């Protein structure tokens, strides 16, 4: 499927590469290519843990800003009321006075200079570790190793307030210091080193325990039969009404495609598994499947309710250029 839609490469979890068939000669330090022609890079475990680990990862340093202490909740209600939600509900303002400080202890005030000093130290540590890692690997490999470091974008600046500055200092050090490596994208690496081992990656994901249990377990498995049924029906509609002109039916078909995609959003199943805003996630799945199903029968029976269609579009107007024919 990836190759069919022009995707040249993807990134898999560490075990997705280590358990590939046949076993990759260079482990996670060189890409592999599947029989279908899609190239896979694997997350590097060492560099990932240095940033992501909840125990000793960089973002958890005690000098960094505490994400969970916000004046929207900390300040006296009468003082903060003009700056929170118009209905009086406390919300995050983005203004946070405290640093992480430690575990299970009173929080100290955030000190910008301490945080910036820590960034400098950690960026240097990351650089030294990659330098040593690449030097070691190069002695065992006859091609340059690649250290693939994928991270969620929301880590930098959102969860880890100092994260963007850490990236800036790291890149600055790499540019000015004498390094035994260069920064490179997967696409650039493929262009420079096009020969690679043919192997099939093992199934993997970024979710807890590395497979699919976050999105398929006893708390959310009920949703899958409805999602599969809706997907089959979407394909049925596209086959029955191909290449509709600029008609009400086409608008309804496109809206069906929107509702299906929104119902399939992996966030709903993730939220249910994690136990946060569970009822909201259940309701979202039910609402999107419900709207899809109602439109499905209206289209099949040639009884499209224009007012209902407009109502649904006003609620869910994402993907304005969507074309239902992708399901043909």
Give the residues covered by each predicted segment.
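A conserved hydrophobic secondary-structure block that centers on an alpha-helix together
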Residues: 1-4
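His/Asp/Glu-enriched short active-site or ligand-binding loop at hydrolase and phosphoryl-transfer sites
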Residues: 8-20, 184-185
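Active-site and substrate-binding clefts of carbohydrate-active enzymes
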Residues: 21-22, 26-328
């Amino acid at each position: 499927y990836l190759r069919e839609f022009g995707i040249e490469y993807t990134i898999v979890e560490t075990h997705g590469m280590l358990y590939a068939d046949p076993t990759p000669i260079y482990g996670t330090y060189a890409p592999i290519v599947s029989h279908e022609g899609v190239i896979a890079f694997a997350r590097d475990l060492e560099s990932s843990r240095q940033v992501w680990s909840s125990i000793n990862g960089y973002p958890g340093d005690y000098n960094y800003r505490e994400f969970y202490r916000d004046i929207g909740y900390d300040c006296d209600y009468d003082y903060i009321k003009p700056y929170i939600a118009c209905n009086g509900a406390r919300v995050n303002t983005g203004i946070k006075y405290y640093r992480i400080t430690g575990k299970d202890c009173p929080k100290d005030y955030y000190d910008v200079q301490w945080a910036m000093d820590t960034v400098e130290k950690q960026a240097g540590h990351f650089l030294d570790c990659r330098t040593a890692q690449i030097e070691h690997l190069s002695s065992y490999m006859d091609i340059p190793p690649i250290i693939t470091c994928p991270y969620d974008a929301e880590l930098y600046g959102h969860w880890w307030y100092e994260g963007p500055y850490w990236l800036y200092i790291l890149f600055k050090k790499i540019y000015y210091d004498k390094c035994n490596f260069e920064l490179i994208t997967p696409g650039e690496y493929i262009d420079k080193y096009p020969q690679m081992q043919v192997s099939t990656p093992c199934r993997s994901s970024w979710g807890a325990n590395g497979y699919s249990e976050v999105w398929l377990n006893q708390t959310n498995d009920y949703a899958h039969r409805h999602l599969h049924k809706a997907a089959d029906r979407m394909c049925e509609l596209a086959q029955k009404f191909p290449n509709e002109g600029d008609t009400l039916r086409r608008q309804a078909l496109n809206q069906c495609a929107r509702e299906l995609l929104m119902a399939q959003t992996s966030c709903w199943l993730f939220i249910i598994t994690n136990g946060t805003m569970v009822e909201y996630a259940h309701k979202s799945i039910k609402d999107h499947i419900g709207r899809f199903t109602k439109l499905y029968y209206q289209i099949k029976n040639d009884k499209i309710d224009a007012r209902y269609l407009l109502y649904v579009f006003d609620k869910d107007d994402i993907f304005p250029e969507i074309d239902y024919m992708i399901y043909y």
